Amino acid sequence: MAELDAQTIINYISNAPKKTPVKVYLKGNLGDLEFPAEVETFLEQHTGVIFGDWTVIEPLLKEYSSAIESYHVENDARNSAVPLLDLKNINARIEPGAIIRDKVLIGDNAVIMMGATINIGAEIGADSMIDMGAVLGGRAIVGRHCHIGAGTVLAGVVEPASAEPVRIDDNVMVGANAVVIEGVHVGEGAVIAAGAIVTHDVAPHTMVAGVPAKFIKNVDDQTAGKTELEDDLRKL
């Protein structure tokens, strides 16, 4: 997976057209109304739905006020620079309620659970699970066959552009509600206990816990057994 650097993300956000997408339900005498190409319409004679940007649609609602008896507007973003990721062709399991922005890389057979939030530039390796309510900030990198526990935060770094992202190597287990701050590198096979706040790099095949997180022990057979991942959960 190729890391998307901070300056590229900053330029993308800065130069992207800012959009306020809306969905508008209409009722009235709609048969003769004309809409520009940038407005998507699903209209019958007396009812219909239109999609487009509020800057285009708002003037049309005023212009056609004599023909439109009533309307209802649904809107979930204002001047948004980054759309949500198109999920249709991603070879992963992504559950309802996950919020994943564009320019995120998701490996094969990854699992993204309900309520997870994944920001622009983040990368998730094959067979990794991002559990419920976890937050992956901008440019956070998760390797292969990891588990990022429910409520965990991997701090994002889009600004300042010089900051280093969080890097989680392969086969890492992160317990629920842990926090990994920007620039931390977690080595392969490490275990981070639930609720830990990780402020320094974690060596491979070690376990850390506490606030701030400290070395507890090397990962032994008992710990590896208790933190073993279930491949069946990753089958598509």
Swiss-Prot record:
HAMAP family: DapH
Listed SUPFAM superfamilies: Trimeric LpxA-like enzymes
Catalytic reactions of this protein: (S)-2,3,4,5-tetrahydrodipicolinate + acetyl-CoA + H2O = L-2-acetamido-6-oxoheptanedioate + CoA
Protein origin, superkingdom: Bacteria
GO biological-process terms attached to the record: diaminopimelate biosynthetic process; lysine biosynthetic process via diaminopimelate
E.C. number: 2.3.1.89
Pathway named in the protein's UniProt entry: Amino-acid biosynthesis; L-lysine biosynthesis via DAP pathway; LL-2,6-diaminopimelate from (S)-tetrahydrodipicolinate (acetylase route): step 1/3
InterPro entries associated with the record: DapH, DapH_N, Hexapep, Hexapep_transf_CS, Trans_hexapeptide_repeat, Trimer_LpxA-like_sf
Family classification: Belongs to the transferase hexapeptide repeat family. DapH subfamily.
One Gene Ontology molecular-function label: tetrahydrodipicolinate N-acetyltransferase activity
Keywords, comma-separated and alphabetical: Acyltransferase, Amino-acid biosynthesis, Diaminopimelate biosynthesis, Lysine biosynthesis, Repeat, Transferase
The protein's name: 2,3,4,5-tetrahydropyridine-2,6-dicarboxylate N-acetyltransferase
Function of the protein: Catalyzes the transfer of an acetyl group from acetyl-CoA to tetrahydrodipicolinate.
Biological source species: Limosilactobacillus reuteri (strain DSM 20016)
Acyltransferase listed as a keyword: yes
Pfam families, A to Z: DapH_N (PF08503), Hexapep (PF00132), Hexapep_2 (PF14602)
The keyword Repeat is assigned to this record: yes
CDD domains xref list: LbH_THP_succinylT
UniProt enzyme class: transferase
